[in-house]
């Protein structure tokens, strides 16, 4: 009957390399897995609707992440300093990507953004110097409706966003 992984539940468990979470889980709380530096994979259950601040911060061995459609918001610093994270797919349910979500994810090269995103905040990709490929699940017109913070993309080398009906050049 586990519905939530609470604040600091596994924080700093540096030997934790994998964990199986029940499908009924709905919430990953503040820093729930922060500092689990050996955690290599984590499957977010399909019922999770909220991932709180810093939930996976400094999980230095995570290499990829798929965020299910059930998640509605990526709060501040969720994946900050996940230095091995190279690929992320954000589900269509996420509407907001908050500051520092992927900050200092220096290995991040590929990002897929769901069509439900309405806001991308400043410093989401702070020091993401390897991010070359951004794909958006919606159209070019939908992309242009997203509220993009000034300089949201200042630290990334990607020059275009690949949309379902063509590319949008980034400023």
Regions found by a protein language model. Give the residues of each.
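Consensus positions within tandem repeat domains that build extended binding/scaffold surfaces
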Residues: 6-11, 29-34, 52-55, 75-78, ...
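A structural signal for leucine-rich repeat
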Residues: 126, 146-151
């Amino acid at each position: 009957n586990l519905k939530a992984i609470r604040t600091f539940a596994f924080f700093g468990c540096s030997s934790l390399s994998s964990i199986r979470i029940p499908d009924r889980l709905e919430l990953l709380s503040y820093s729930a897995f922060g500092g689990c530096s050996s955690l290599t994979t984590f499957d977010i259950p399909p019922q999770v609707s909220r991932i709180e601040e810093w939930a996976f911060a400094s999980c230095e061995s995570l290499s990829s992440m798929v965020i299910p459609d059930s998640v509605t918001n990526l709060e501040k610093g969720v994946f900050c300093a996940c230095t091995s994270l190279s690929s992320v797919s954000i589900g269509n349910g996420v509407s907001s990507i908050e500051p520092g979500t992927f900050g200092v994810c220096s290995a991040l090269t590929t990002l897929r953004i769901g069509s439900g995103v309405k806001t991308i905040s400043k410093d989401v990709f702070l020091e993401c110097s390897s991010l070359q490929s951004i794909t958006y699940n919606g159209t070019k017109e939908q992309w242009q409706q997203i509220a993009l913070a000034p300089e949201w993309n200042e630290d990334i080398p990607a020059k275009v966003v690949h949309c379902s009906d063509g590319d949008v050049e980034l400023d």
